């Protein structure tokens, strides 16, 4: 059972100062998928982001990295989804995940925002529909909820970054499985992966 995913979104903050911060892990997925498919992402002001398009397994997949700030991501997602008549359940959103360690990434369908401002705004702008797919890229947790804001806007130490990068690479490899064979097979493969 394949999934008709038509849009992959990588949540991020715009600008060079945020490019390597943990909160931008979702964007790294989109950038890596574009690189693997030799596609350039270009600025599209009407979608408030950078976009591209790839074809994989005979399916067109639009790529989007919002260039709004994280807490306004939904404006970008909704603009592109509405223009191309893409339903929430045809969207996969890649985002950083505090509740998973670096080196781990997991696919999920539906659910709440878990305190993630990018997901919160996207759910709100999609009419409170939470049925989109998610790719949760583990970044770890600082251990104290009061330190989360600085943690996500900070850069990971080299070893942690290598683990995050390895999980992003594996997630990109699993995208083909997700699109061709469905969520369960993609989860089975990705969820058994852990970079050390």
Swiss-Prot record:
Keyword Transferase included in the entry's annotation: no
Keyword tags: Cytoplasm, Hydrolase, RNA-binding, tRNA-binding
InterPro entries: Pept_tRNA_hydro, Pept_tRNA_hydro_CS, Pept_tRNA_hydro_sf
Active site: 23 (proton acceptor)
GO MF: peptidyl-tRNA hydrolase activity; tRNA binding
Alphabetized Gene3D superfamilies for the sequence: Peptidyl-tRNA hydrolase
Positions with a binding annotation for tRNA: 18, 69, 71, 117
UniProt cross-references to Pfam families, sorted A to Z: Pept_tRNA_hydro
Site (Discriminates between blocked and unblocked aminoacyl-tRNA): 13
Site (Stabilizes the basic form of H active site to accept a proton): 96
Annotated compartments: Cytoplasm
Record flagged with keyword tRNA-binding: yes
EC number of the protein: 3.1.1.29
Catalytic reaction equation(s): an N-acyl-L-alpha-aminoacyl-tRNA + H2O = an N-acyl-L-amino acid + a tRNA + H(+)
GO biological process: protein quality control for misfolded or incompletely synthesized proteins; rescue of stalled ribosome
CC annotations in GO: cytoplasm
Job of this protein: Hydrolyzes ribosome-free peptidyl-tRNAs (with 1 or more amino acids incorporated), which drop off the ribosome during protein synthesis, or as a result of ribosome stalling.
Family per similarity comment: Belongs to the PTH family.
Subunit structure: Monomer.
Family matches, as HAMAP family: Pept_tRNA_hydro_bact
Name listed for the protein in its UniProt record: Peptidyl-tRNA hydrolase
Gene: pth
